[in-house]
Regions:
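Phosphate/NTP-binding elements of NTP-utilizing enzymes
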Residues: 2-313, 318-320, 405
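Generic structural signal for hydrophobic core residues of well-folded globular domains
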Residues: 67, 71, 100-101, 343, ...
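RNase H-like, metal-dependent nuclease domains and their acidic two-metal-ion catalytic environment used
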Residues: 94-95, 174-177, 205, 213, ...
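Short, surface-exposed acidic/glycine-rich loop or hinge patches that mediate macromolecular interfaces
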Residues: 118, 183, 244, 384, ...
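Short acidic-glycine loop/turn motifs at beta-strand connectors
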Residues: 151-153, 343-347, 453
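Short, surface-exposed basic-aromatic patches at helix termini and helix-loop junctions that form
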Residues: 194-199, 223-227, 399, 419-429, ...
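Acidic, glycine-rich loop-and-strand cores that form catalytic or ligand-binding grooves
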Residues: 452, 456-458
Length: 554
């Protein structure tokens, strides 16, 4: 593979035997080692299996073959590789780099790998692991500033693609790889990284995870699909999870568990496994999801024997105007304190157990909202004539329902009341959850959708069409709830959701704020379920029963 061309204009004199297919090189009897090398370098699938020793699946090999062909023929094409989560996208790219380093080690030239944040370190670690082959072990070198991996005269240089990083000046002779494409800044990529390909019409490969329709990855997908429509050359490789599961039975089991846990249409499952953008599906609670939330059970006026109940409380601030019974509130637009009672039931196929904290159904118990307590502005710990303390009213309500556990939003004004309820009911029966902060609320929203999408959240039916009723208010808030994704667009980290503060609705009393207090109260049960699932909580059901006696002499 020695090159006779000048360093300024590299020429890939590797067409024979590398691109003629298997069995077209010298006879094994004339030069076994040369024949074996040419045989294994003729196809990245063979190289993966026999040199690296970690055979790639067909769904990984197929796009890599197209990329290798573009690199060797200097077609200058761009490719997009999107695989379901944890199905080997980065493994495939690491093996591609090792293959090209081995193929080009005498010819020379450079490849560039760009990523943001942790993606850069992951790419380097994976490459080092895959360079540990009989052909490359002890022969590759690592250099710094920027980090560079060299095998013979070929190299891969790793650069940060963050807009504030100093990454100019490098050349991608053969290949440019950009990882985490969903997080890339399009203007920065076009200004800094795309020109690196110019000198030798290098191939570009974009990797990433599906997030939003407006990010770099999805926009690039549209561009490349248009190019393919014009010339027929495939450029976009979106690997469906079914293709992965067909080749990897273990992945099929894993995928089934994710769908069972979150639901097929949960944004995490839809985006990361089924490659569907999360912002193209309506609001946070589109009609199909709202239908999942509607139960067939009525609202209850009191607890029933032998049923297990929990409570979720979204606590609002107090209003100074509440010092007198019937007096006008100083801030009538403030949120309400809402306590939602949930009944825990199990699927019909479940075996009854005394402790629902132990998984007795696939996915866990079903949470059915059966009642709600609402208060507007009452002082938490100060009574007034004809106006009891909110603390006492809440305690009476929780005791009347004999709740097995209570979760309360303890952020801000909630910590004091949470501590007071814990002292009154028992600390093992009260969870004070800090909902303040975007990360905690993002996770709560994601967990709530997992409950809904797996059929385990149900709100009572019967009054949803009666204006100003509790059920009506809940569904108005569900409809008004919006969402957005910030930062990297990770649904369980970057979700921003809630009813806009400016949202208003026309009621028989006039135009009123919509609020999101009933929705947030109900949502808190998802945090209760997360803790139950993780083993941090165990809900006990107790009942008095008369056990018939038995004659010991009979």
């Amino acid at each position: 593979m020695d090159s006779t061309s000048s360093p300024q204009e590299p020429s890939l004199a590797v067409s024979s035997p590398f691109r003629k297919g298997l069995g077209r090189g010298p006879s094994p009897t004339s030069n076994d080692r040369a024949w074996l090398a040419s045989h294994l370098l003729a196809d990245i699938g063979l190289f993966s299996r026999h040199v690296i020793g970690l055979p790639l699946y067909d769904y990984q090999v197929q796009p890599l073959r197209a990329i290798v062909d573009a690199v060797l023929s200097r077609q200058g094409r761009e490719f997009l590789l999107v695989f379901p989560r944890q199905s080997g996208k980065n493994e495939a790219v690491a093996q591609l780099l090792v293959y090209l380093l081995a193929l080009l080690q005498r010819h020379g030239g450079q490849m560039v790998y760009g990523a943001i944040g942790d993606g850069l370190g992951r790419g380097m670690r994976r490459l080092e692991q895959r360079l540990d082959t009989p052909w490359t072990r002890g022969r590759w070198r690592r250099g710094g500033r920027p980090t560079r991996y060299t095998l013979g005269q070929a190299a891969v240089v790793f650069l940060s693609s963050h807009p504030q990083a100093a990454s100019r000046g490098e050349t991608a002779d053969h290949l440019l790889i950009l990882d985490e494409a969903q997080d890339q800044d399009a203007a920065h990529i076009e200004a800094v990284f795309t020109p690196m390909r110019a000198a030798h019409n290098a191939t570009a490969v974009y990797l990433g995870t599906v997030r939003r329709t407006g990010d770099f990855l999805w926009v690039k997908k549209g561009e490349l699909e248009s190019a393919t429509a014009a010339d027929g050359h495939p450029r976009v490789f979106l690997v469906a999870p079914d293709a992965v599961a067909a080749e990897n039975p273990a992945y099929a089991i894993f995928l089934a568990e994710q769908v069972r846990r979150y639901g097929r249409r949960h944004p995490i499952v839809a985006a990361e496994y089924f490659l569907e953008p999360v912002d193209g599906r309506g609001g946070l609670f589109p009609p199909w999801r709202a239908a999942f939330m509607r139960g067939a059970h009525p609202r209850l006026g009191a607890p029933r024997p032998d049923e297990l109940y929990v409570a979720a409380i979204d606590l609002a601030g107090q209003d100074e105007g509440a010092a007198e019974a019937g007096g006008p509130l100083h801030n009538p637009g403030h949120d309400y304190t809402v306590a939602t009672i949930f009944r825990l039931t199990e699927a019909a196929e479940a075996v009854e157990t005394e402790l629902l904290g132990r998984n007795s159904v696939s996915g866990g118990p079903i949470y059915e909202a059966v009642d709600v307590f609402v208060d507007h502005g009452s002082r938490h710990f100060q009574a007034a004539p004809g106006q009891p303390r909110l603390a006492d009213t809440l305690l009476t309500y929780l005791r009347r329902w004999n709740v097995a556990h209570t979760i309360i939003d303890a952020a801000g004004v909630g910590q004091g009341l949470a501590d007071w309820l814990a002292a009154a009911l028992g600390r093992e029966r009260v969870t004070a959850h800090q909902l303040g902060g975007s990360g905690a609320k993002a996770r709560l929203g994601s967990d709530l959708l997992a409950l809904i999408d797996t059929g385990r959240f149900r709100y009572w039916t019967g009054d949803e069409d009666e204006p100003l009723s509790d059920g009506w208010w809940f569904w108005q808030q569900v409809v008004a709830c919006g969402y957005s994704l910030s930062g990297a667009g990770r649904f369980d980290h970057d979700l921003r959701w809630g009813v806009p503060a400016a949202a208003r609705i026309t009621t028989p009393r006039g135009v009123e704020p919509t609020h999101d207090d009933r929705l947030l109260s109900a949502a808190l049960v998802a945090e209760l379920e997360r803790r139950r699932r993780d083993g941090a909580l165990l809900f006990g059901a107790s009942a008095s029963r008369i056990i018939p006696g038995r004659d010991p002499l009979s």
